[in-house]
Amino acid sequence: MQVRSFLKFTLAATALAAAGLAQAQAPLPAGYKAEYKMSLVVGTAFPWGKGGEIWANLVKERTQGRINIKLYPGVSLVQGDQTREFTAIRQGVIDMAIGSTINWSPQIKELNLFSLPFLMPDYKAIDALTQGEVGKQIFQIVDKAGALPLAWGENGYREITNSKKPIKSPEDLKGMKIRVVGSPLFLDTFTALGANPTQMSWADAQPALSSGAVDGQENPMSIFTAAKLHTVGQKNVTMWGYVADPLIFVVNKDVWASWTPADQAIVRQAAIDAGKQQIAIARKGLDEADKPLLKEIAALGVTITQLSPAE
């Protein structure tokens, strides 16, 4: 009897294992790729990249592995050229992305709206734009331009840093070499302020800061801390909140069409959920009254200048 019971148990266990293996090795639906490529400017040490990781993980979990996403930080799918990212999404070189409205503005001029100086004075203003009617209209424009937008994220307010001196007025910027992103609006803004702006990709920015080829840059504080910009001479930060940098979660249209309606719904909701989490991460330490992130940065030996509304 013991032998018979043992055999029954062994056969049952083998059958369960085989069933589990068959389920794990179930073929993908027709038209699905084994892996989808997600483009990001920065890696998962940054709130932006963390948003990509959260989105990918949620999608994999909720689709039970039918949709597997690999992250490609550093805009590596387009050799680091941030301004080519949207075109590559439209062409199918990139399957998915979380991209900056700034980087995509050369192809979608309406996205320059978000780069107008001092348009969004606080987080409530950002939310009013992105989560309201304007945000819906922007999504329609992005859709018409060739990619399917699903959710909003956020890089943050772009504050200016430099290796020379505290900046309190345009006079302090005169002649200063500032790295800016590849949008003509940023060139015009910093030229008008008297600086000497230089466009370059993020991949080139840190070596340029380290060598002194440029004096400063402008980016959210989460970028400053994650990239440890205080180690490349950036010892002065001016909090002026002149431009906020929303992010958009998108999918290539052909890729989207290849998925079942059920999986489309999963990917969309995962993007929305990831976007909310990513925004919370990007604002952490800055939306509290005492701004603890600024205290952490000051403790690194960085001089922080906070401009008054009049300034």
Which residues make up each language-model segment?
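N-terminal export leaders
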Residues: V3-T10
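N-terminal secretory/targeting leader peptides
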Residues: S5, Q25-A125, V134-K136, Q140-E311
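Bacterial N-terminal signal peptides
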Residues: T10-A18
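Active-site-proximal, glycine-rich beta->alpha crossover segments in alpha/beta enzymes
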Residues: L129
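N-terminal signal peptide c-region/cleavage motif recognized by signal peptidases
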Residues: A19-A24
